[in-house]
C-alpha cells in the first residue's frame, strides 16, 4: 500500500533547502501528494506554520479538488498544479476508469484558475472510444482554459508494460511482449505505439497533427501579442521593470524537484 510522508518531515527538508541553499521553488513530483484532502491540508498547514518564502507545485487530482482546498494551497505558496485530465469525453473517461466526468473537470479547472493557480492540462489521444469528435472536444477545452503558462500539446496513449492497456494490447495481438514494445513499437512518445481506436493509423496521425498545430498556433499567437505589448510598454510607458528581451523570466529560479 501507499503511505504518504509526514508533512512535518517533508517541510523539514524544504526548510533546510531554503536556509542552506537558497532554494525558493520546490516541485513535488509524487503523483499522490494530493492522495486525499486530509494529506493535502496537512502539507499546507506545515507550509503555513513555517512561513517560508518558498513557492511550490505538485501533481493533482481533480477528484479531491474544492475551491476551499485550492485557496489554502494558493495561500501557502502553490502556484501550479499538474492535472492528468486525459480526455474531455465522458465515454472515454468511463472506459479509462478515471472516476471523473467532464463536468467535474471543468469545475476543478475553473476553480483552480479563479484562486490564481496555473493548471497543467494533460491530454492523451487513442483510448477506447476516442475519435475525431473526442479530439475536437479536447482541443476546444485546452484553448478555452489556456492561461499560456505552458505550451499545450496532445500525445498518443502508450500502453506501458504492466498497465491494463498493455495486457489488452497483448490479448488483442497488437503487442508481442516487452521486447516488442521497447524495440519495435515505443520509438517516440509523440508517435503511435498501439492503435486502440477505430481510426486508421493515417487518420490517427491526421488528428494529432491538426490538434497540435491548432494548439501551438494558438499559443504562439498569444506569445507574439504579449511580446508586442511589452515592446510598447517599455518605450511608450518607460517601464523600468522590464528585464530585457533575451531574459527568460522564470518562477523556477532556485528550483528543486522533490518526492513527497
What are these regions (language model features)?
Residues 19-22, 52, 146-147, 170, ...:
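Proline-centered flexible-loop/turn and helix-kink motifs
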Residues 38, 91, 95-96, 125-133, ...:
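Flexible glycine/acidic-rich beta-alpha junction loops that bind and position SAM and/or redox cofactors
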Residues 119, 149-153, 217-224:
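Bilobed periplasmic-binding protein-like "clamshell/Venus-flytrap" ligand-binding domains
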Residues 134-138:
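Short alpha-helix in the alpha/beta-hydrolase fold that links the catalytic acid
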Residues 140-148:
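Basic phosphate/pyrophosphate-binding loop/patch that engages nucleotide-derived ligands
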Residues 164-169, 177-260:
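Radical SAM enzyme core and accessory elements
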Residues 1-119, 125-127, 140:
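Radical SAM [4Fe-4S] cluster-binding motif and immediate context
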